[in-house]
């Protein structure tokens, strides 16, 4: 009987339940609102406008802390220290009230005295959403909107990168990845707590202000510049004498004059080969060959000074010589000249610091005097034109010279 009742009740209940199911079922989910990137950019621009006074104040503080105007920064530092040490509690309350009332008065005057533009004038003067009225009532064109979106994404990416770097640095300090930095950080915190407990608040503020102004790198830069200028004013004669008189060469008779290699002719000023070839060729003979070959190429391109008269007459008398033989004679003559000019320092030591040349300590030849130096002592670059080269490429191409030759050529 029970089963029959259940079977009978099944079809009776189903008609009553089925019509109520659609009424009790939840409505179909509505489509989620689409994300509008341009509205996000407009909100960001409005936020920039609202925070513009704070940004200007931060720029002013950074301008003072970086000592862009040393006198103004010094007066600000001293004035704040005097205020921190002399003002009592009542004076501080007065300063707080003044700091509240002055911005309020300025904002009221700005709002009252500002001219309100109509919509037509605003649309005519519209430009890249700079003011708040432009953002609220003006409409941007498609190129302007795309430019705003791109600028926003670039700024957002830079901000997130800086934030990630800051968080990583904080985690490194907190996790003691660098014990020195972490110990300094926690030591500074403990020192600050002790200072707040032991010293009065006015002295704490004075120390903090002095640290911000006098403890940065820009302050030491300004001090070093003023010290250098003061020394130059106190002894200008010594400075001029140091610049005007180069170090005298070693005079040891005729041999000493030959070794000192005096001022070179324009033909000899066309310097030897490139630095790469000089560094790759370790033995002396390979180094000389690289100098000779590249020197010949530079001479042919630059059309240097003519050969001596005797050589020219000999070439004219031998009219049957071909171009290859003429070139061969020039090669032999310039090779002999370069070998005479090659420095006497063939023992593998740097002329400047006396370091021994090795696989790691490469030999480098000064393109002006020809002496052998290491890469550290011969690291000054000068254009070939300063050495007398007249080719158009000489204005762009540079060669390595030693310190003394660099001072001589740069005058």
UniProtKB/Swiss-Prot annotation:
Region entry Necessary for interaction with RAB11A and function in neurite outgrowth, spans: 51-64
- GO cellular component assignments: axon; cytosol; dendrite; endoplasmic reticulum; endoplasmic reticulum membrane; endoplasmic reticulum tubular network; growth cone membrane; intracellular membrane-bounded organelle
- Which sequence ranges are listed under topological domain Cytoplasmic? 1-66, 110-187, 209-411
**Membrane-traversing stretches:** 67-87, 89-109
Keywords on record: Cell membrane, Cell projection, Disease variant, Endoplasmic reticulum, Endosome, Hereditary spastic paraplegia, Membrane, Metal-binding, Neurodegeneration, Phosphoprotein, Transmembrane, Transmembrane helix, Zinc, Zinc-finger
Question: Subunit structure, per the record?
Answer: Can form homooligomers (monomers, dimers and tetramers). Interacts with RAB11A (GDP-bound form); regulates RAB11A. Interacts with FKBP8; may negatively regulate ZFYVE27 phosphorylation. Interacts with VAPA (via MSP domain); may regulate ZFYVE27 retention in the endoplasmic reticulum and its function in cell projections formation. Interacts with VAPB (via MSP domain). Interacts with REEP1, REEP5 and ATL1. Interacts with ATL2, ATL3 and SPAST. Interacts with KIF5A and RTN3. Interacts with RAB11B (GDP-bound form), SURF4, KIF5B and KIF5C.
What name has this protein been given in UniProt? Protrudin
